[in-house]
Amino acid sequence: MSDDNNTTLTRRRFLTRGAMAASALALPYYIPASALGHDGAVAPSERIVMGGIGIGGRGSYDLGSMLAEQEVQWVAVCDVLKSRREAAKNRVDSRQGNKDCAVYADMRQLLAERTDVDAVLIATGDRWHALASILAMRAGKDVYCEKPACLTMAQGQTVVETARRYARVYQTGAQRLSEPNHVFAIEMARSGRLGQIHTAYADIRWRDGMRHDWLPAEPEPPKDELDWDVWLGPCPWRPYNQGYVNGGGWYHYYDFATDVAMWGAHSVAQALAGLDMTNVSFIEFEYEGPDATMVTRLSNGVKLVLFRVGGSVWEPCKFWHGACGERFDGPKGWVAAADDYSGP
């Protein structure tokens, strides 16, 4: 379309002109104001048609937030747990005042069948995040994926490559990058007021290690209630135990998650945002001390320290009080930010 406002024909204007042409005919024709986006309504042509993949826990919270947006029309939900997908459908139908929300047990079916879906929410367990995002973008969907975006560097690189190749919008849950206290710290670091940043810190909240053992085998539930193979997805097979599925128990196991990404998905992104990463790469990684602190060195000489504060996410540290923080040190001073921050 032309950039000239006089010649641009948007979908909204196209529909409006079509309605005017119809009214010129000697035929009775009624178009509701809501169909044209009048009276505060969003025209169907301007709505974002969405589907959800993984609607338990964080996914349930995200679903509620997105349903509150007037522009969003939710048409499908997918969850490997029957109880969750049915609860999500009922919630969507109640909010939208119809019974149109379709349910799926397998995301691949949703992505293949729902050509009307513009974007998907992905809030599965961490093990599925990267692969589900890649499959969705290949199917022509834009993606909002809960953090962490991936479990490995190779997965992350493939997610980025797929978004570029298929020209898709991809966003992961790094909301602290837009919260005022973190924005202030990041902008201070980049402004030069602290001088050239030489050291940055990020709180990764690493615990005492991930479990590698198996829970005792239990009988698998019926596949229509929970398909265990689909739940495992890209992970190595192990026998079913409800302890993995209920209450986020999977999060403590190396095959299903990476503990560093719990807070690191936020804090490392915040630290990197405050540094000038143009043509910069990581050149060295080294563990220091008994608390799993990792010191990384960048090719521009900056040192990035990823450290574990302690067992409690609210345990104070020497740099700040509060969770999920970052700090930048320069020759002229320092700045730090964290959730519910108070200075040391």
Regions found by a protein language model. Name each.
Residues 33-36, 184, 196, 201-205, ...:
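Contiguous beta-strand/loop segments that form the cofactor/metal-binding neighborhood of enzyme cores
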